[in-house]
Regions:
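Mobile active-site "lid"/loop adjacent to the S-adenosyl-L-methionine
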Residues: 209-218, 264-285
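Short helix-start
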Residues: 7, 30-56
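Polyanion-binding surface elements
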Residues: 1-20
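Conserved proline-anchored active-site loop of SAM-dependent methyltransferases
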Residues: 82, 97-111, 122-126, 191, ...
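Class I S-adenosyl-L-methionine-dependent methyltransferase module
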Residues: 114-236, 274
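S-adenosyl-L-methionine
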Residues: 58-96, 106
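Class I S-adenosyl-L-methionine
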Residues: 323-356
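Conserved Class I SAM-dependent methyltransferase catalytic core
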Residues: 286-335
Length: 356
């Protein structure tokens, strides 16, 4: 009878971390590995996999944590600019970090790679997205197992069957109610749909149902064990909320850095990708957010906010210049990453507004 060992046993035998063993299991790097309940079991005869992170005897290539989904308004292209604009005092006078509208988390992950905060708060009005964050934090191994199954099933199909498979999973995602018992399944479907849909969009109709069409990808890679495990470790002490951005007022104080990355004000009728939830973000909402920005500023919090620059299309549009007249407004160059017309992607100016 074949005997098995736990990840802990394998870690001791191979002189690597238990977390690394879990990643190798999730990536199918260990022959004969299986899932029992919510834990991996490994054949006692299994050999330690060759470390693919090493390159010809040089130092291991260590990739930084990066977003697990493609997200409209993602800040990957702006990370250097954002970091150059951080306030002084992080780690001393600034010990807390808050990010409502966290989205894909590019800035969050980059920030946590370089800085340590005593308390961290993230939120978003998209309950499905925040469920994924919670599952990565609390049930990463189960999530990786579910993603591995979806990835293998999809990649083994013809393009015609992949399309049918996509719409079956989209229907399942829209049908399942988000409960404790379905949280992992919904999170895995969320990531699958994001990576196999058209252009990486998240869009819902007026009934709140996800309605992005099939993206015709011949293969997908959604079971990134190393990245998700790294993110899981980062999120262990993070407060994760699915709520309106106003909730952060209870968390923010004079020792807090708050970064707002709300749905951008569209530059024209066709450029708005604000339907991440069933509620659009109007000019009235932008004005309300500006008032809240001022409220947090009056509490002593250090506040940064990104948004579109209307002067890209109308030099006389002073909407944000007037709203944030009392604060520091910078115009920075960014890349448009998601657009319904791929040919219209390119460089564009964005606003970065700070109270310091």
């Amino acid at each position: 009878m074949l005997q098995y060992m736990s990840c802990r046993d394998a870690a001791e035998r191979w002189n690597i971390s238990q977390r690394r063993v879990s990643v190798l299991c999730a990536e199918n790097r260990i022959q004969g590995v299986a899932m029992l309940g919510n834990m991996w079991i490994i054949p006692i005869t299994a050999e330690k996999p060759v470390d693919a992170r090493k390159n010809n005897g040089t130092k291991p290539v260590v990739e930084k944590a990066h977003p697990f989904v493609k997200w409209a308004g993602g800040k990957t292209q702006l990370l250097d600019v954002l970091k150059c604009n951080l306030p002084s005092g992080i780690g001393t006078s600034i010990t807390k970090y808050a990010e409502p509208f966290v989205g894909g988390g590019a800035f969050l992950f980059s920030l946590l790679e370089d800085y340590r905060f005593e308390e961290i708060y993230i939120s978003d009005n998209n309950k499905e997205l925040m469920n994924v964050y919670q599952m990565i934090r609390d049930n990463c191994v189960e999530l990786l197992y579910a993603l591995d199954i979806l990835q293998n099933e999809y990649n083994g199909l013809s393009i015609e069957l992949q399309e049918r498979f996509y719409y079956e999973k989209r229907e399942e995602f829209n049908t399942i109610e988000l409960t404790e018992g379905t949280s992992v399944r919904k999170a895995s479907l969320f990531i699958f749909l994001n990576k196999s849909c058209f252009n990486g969009l998240y869009r819902v109709n007026k009934k709140g149902k996800y309605n992005v069409p099939f993206g015709k990808h011949k293969s997908i890679s959604i079971c990134d064990g190393e990245n998700l495990t790294k993110i899981s470790a980062m999120l262990q002490n993070v407060e994760i909320k699915s709520c309106d951005y106003h909730d952060v007022v209870r968390f923010a104080d004079s020792s807090t850095l708050v970064y707002f990355d709300p749905p951008y004000r569209p530059l024209n009728v066709t450029s708005g990708f604000t339907s991440y939830t069933e509620n659009d973000f109007s000019d009235k909402d932008q004005i309300e957010l500006a008032e809240f920005y001022k409220e947090l500023s009056s509490k002593g919090a250090k506040v940064m906010l990104s948004n579109s620059d209307p002067k890209n299309t109308n030099e006389n549009d002073n909407f944000f210049d007037d709203l944030y007249a009392d604060f520091n407004i910078s115009r920075v160059e960014a890349s448009r990453m998601i657009n319904s017309k791929g040919s219209s992607r390119g460089k564009i100016k964005e606003l970065l507004i700070k109270n310091f």
